[in-house]
Amino acid sequence: MNKINQLRNFLNKQNCDAYLIPKNDEYFGEYVPKNKDRLKFISGFTGSTGLALILKNKSYLFVDGRYTLQAKKEIYKDFKICEIPKIKPHYILKNLNKEITLGFDPKLFTSNTLKNIISNSLVKIKPINNNLIDAVWKNKTKINNNKFYILEEKYHGENYLNKISKINKFLKLKDIHYLLTTAVENISWLLNIRGSDASSSPLTNGKILFNKNGKIIYLQILIKLHLKLKNLLERK
């Protein structure tokens, strides 16, 4: 049984009629680790941006004009190429002229992206926390516990405590109770850390949540939080 048919079997179990697969992972960075390149796994396409829409009887790959020729050479025969903006996902969904349930991994999409995809269609969206591509991808390589390091002051120029203090003042000024930061480049800058999660950029993946007093109440950097950084943050 090929990958698409396996995915459709999982869709049936979830009572879904379709499924979305983006290029990005949950950190929305420019570079996607090989073991999170779900679009390549399901379609064969290796370009830097794209979106797959899997229906019960058809499969679509949406790419912009830069990638149409590349996609023709790479994609599996199950897929039809749709060049954006000539054909957008909501065109396909709208022209189905029927109600369908569209499954997606909520970690991989913003609300605005979803609104654009389902606009003017009869689509009901259904978040599925366990990614269905991962369920099909049995031989996926394990996520590496990539190391990261703290920059010396001569390189970053400003202590992370000073930066957090500025955030604290801003939150109080605007009467904001919490600030969630998920952009990996912002976190790397804020905490003066660098890493190797991206193949072509010294970034470390993570998410950070501040309260209105500027205190870090949640820090997620995979499972890599080493003792030195942990001690520094706990002093705050």
List where the protein language model places each region.
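Ligand-binding face of N-terminal immunoglobulin V-set domains in extracellular IgSF glycoproteins
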Residues: L102
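N-terminal accessory/capping or targeting/presequence segment of soluble
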Residues: M1-N95, F109, T113-N116, N120-K236
